[in-house]
From Swiss-Prot:
GO cellular component entries: cytoplasm
Family assignment from sequence similarity: Belongs to the FGAMS family.
Protein's gene: purL
Function: Part of the phosphoribosylformylglycinamidine synthase complex involved in the purines biosynthetic pathway. Catalyzes the ATP-dependent conversion of formylglycinamide ribonucleotide (FGAR) and glutamine to yield formylglycinamidine ribonucleotide (FGAM) and glutamate. The FGAM synthase complex is composed of three subunits. PurQ produces an ammonia molecule by converting glutamine to glutamate. PurL transfers the ammonia molecule to FGAR to form FGAM in an ATP-dependent manner.
Organism (species): Bacillus cereus (strain Q1)
Major subcellular location class: cytoplasm
Positions contributing to substrate binding: S99, H100, N101, H102, R121, Q245, E317, S318, Q319, S540
Biochemical pathway: Purine metabolism; IMP biosynthesis via de novo pathway; 5-amino-1-(5-phospho-D-ribosyl)imidazole from N(2)-formyl-N(1)-(5-phospho-D-ribosyl)glycinamide: step 1/2
Enzyme superclass (EC): ligase
Any GO molecular function: magnesium ion binding
Binding site for Mg(2+) 1: E98, N538
Keyword vocabulary terms for this entry: ATP-binding, Cytoplasm, Ligase, Magnesium, Metal-binding, Nucleotide-binding, Purine biosynthesis
UniProt name for this protein: Phosphoribosylformylglycinamidine synthase subunit PurL
Amino acid sequence: MSLMLEPNPTQIKEERIYAEMGLTDEEFAMVEKILGRLPNYTETGLFSVMWSEHCSYKNSKPVLRKFPTTGERVLQGPGEGAGIVDIGDNQAVVFKMESHNHPSAIEPYQGAATGVGGIIRDVFSMGARPVALLNSLRFGELQSPRVKYLFEEVVAGIAGYGNCIGIPTVGGEVQFDPCYEGNPLVNAMCVGLINHEDIKKGQAHGAGNTVMYVGASTGRDGIHGATFASEELSESSEAKRPAVQVGDPFMEKLLIEACLELIQSDALVGIQDMGAAGLTSSSAEMASKAGMGIEMYLDDVPQRETGMTPYEMMLSESQERMLIVVKKGREQEIVDLFEKYGLAAVTMGKVTEDKMLRLFHKGEMVAEVPADALAEEAPIYHKPSQEAAYFAEFQQMKMETPKVENYKETLFALLQQPTIASKEWVYDQYDYQVRTSTVVTPGSDAAVVRVRGTEKGLAMTTDCNSRYIYLDPEVGGKIAVAEAARNIVCSGGEPLAITDCLNFGNPEKPEIFWQIEKSVDGMSEACRTLQTPVIGGNVSMYNERSGEAVYPTPTVGMVGLVHDLKHVTTQEFKQAGDLVYVIGETKAEFGGSELQKMLHGKIFGQSPSIDLDVELKRQKQILAAIQAGLVQSAHDVAEGGLAVAISESAIGANGLGATVKLDGEATAALFAESQSRFVITVKRENKEAFEKAVEAIQVGEVTNTNEVTIHNEENEVLLTANVDEMRKAWKGAIPCLLK
């Protein structure tokens, strides 16, 4: 739309054009009051995008305040591009997770690829070198052709971007449930390393300093992407393909190197990624955080399309762009630095003292808005909350143990459930060894990456069982954090902190808002007990298709510190003769389990219970035993229960099996999904020391028979399974479904 054709302020009000941009009548009245006049078209666009849920968190802020965000090691909590945690020796780890759900639903390859690109920029804008990527993905059932297409394209998009840019994709999770059929979830996480003195903030300090635009040129892609992410998907969403950005990983690779060199220069004052809401959010947020204003001359914006209006330039979400503030008089150094990498760096404005964001185009002022009004003063809504109707019904159900006729057949069927089955088809497309720092590759409880120049490593994982959270949001929220910590501990790491990606339906529905509140309550309590503060994250609402919401999916991304790489532990059995231990008590808990879903085609009842104090005690004991060199392998018991966990530890080894005896009712002993449980193997000579250090029950030993045999307490054989056959079933399940 050319400037001549844009509606005037009176038309915007009378024809309610602001509503098409996502502003309510009340919000538009607030804008009018803030400005003391009617806004023009560009100004209306600025407010609509900055006040969207995606940028302002206006529906979720009251809930997010419940998270613990400080801790001894926390150097930067929520509010910047990414959070930062101290790991000793003047080094810190920088990490964040974000969603790209709506774009991936309609343009899966580019949606996923640009999700990866955006999260990488958040990390290097802090001054950190990105060292690893992870992802957490949710899709419908693979029997559907549309789901197959989305799954294949999302994985290809993540691989295409990550592999080209040269950052290893080392871990993640993929789950399949019918509720994600029309609305897949694509959450990407990036982890970086930094020295303390290199930490940079997205702040525009120093009146008179120069505002520069660096990186790729601006096109019309992604306009109103943030607003698009703040509404439900519908049939008309397909028409919004232009709102999906297009990524160029090679450009981003150059941008990383140029920015990391720039960060070493004392000419740099502040730096921020142009992410959601592009130039608008980066300029308004940098000015607001510093208590300053910014003037920008939009004729100087590098444009790759002709005739772009101020509105289009400010709202474009073209990829691979950064906004920087540099000391006045040092601009040429910056231009030269970026030129060396073949990238543009242009002066397009200056920092001012009056806290206003002013935009000029073709010699005229086209917008004048208080920076704080855009970045900080979006309305905050305390949405009504109402317990979901199904919850009381599920809580009152008398839970029966599912009827299982044949334990071996059931185990094989569980190993072939896509959520449990091997994800090798996925991660074999990712380069997880590039940079040669990956110590534990995908497929174990957590990935581990070496901290170069030290004996240390970083363990990292993404976790969330959304079925449990649907059944009981508060308990499920606790379990999500606890399971992430369990995976870190099983890998030899001390849990440090989390980033989260809160994926929910429409928050304007009281039952959905109740899910949000309760799951955040549960997560917050777990974070406090396990001492893993929340250092940043992302909220993705309106994940619905035709009014049906996805399961509440607050994904947890956790990073832990492996103090010495010789403590690194993996899940597979190591040698015949080692003793097998189970830690934790098994109860007949099947609500939300893989067995329940497989046998009944749906989930119902109560989620498994969790005692966070018991969880913490077990994790501390196990980590101490690992650090004392007493543990051969460690694996948390998750989907599918003990039978699956023991089988996975055998499948990962070569030529090894196990003979195990489990007490209690057979179906529960094998397949229940009780929490805070671990399968651990120990060398025979360490038996006494291990049993002194950890409250554990020896249930059997590792054999060289290549079979897993499980007995009941009467010593009757419940099942015997050949490990090669299990491996074939487990590895073949997803490729078979995709054929």
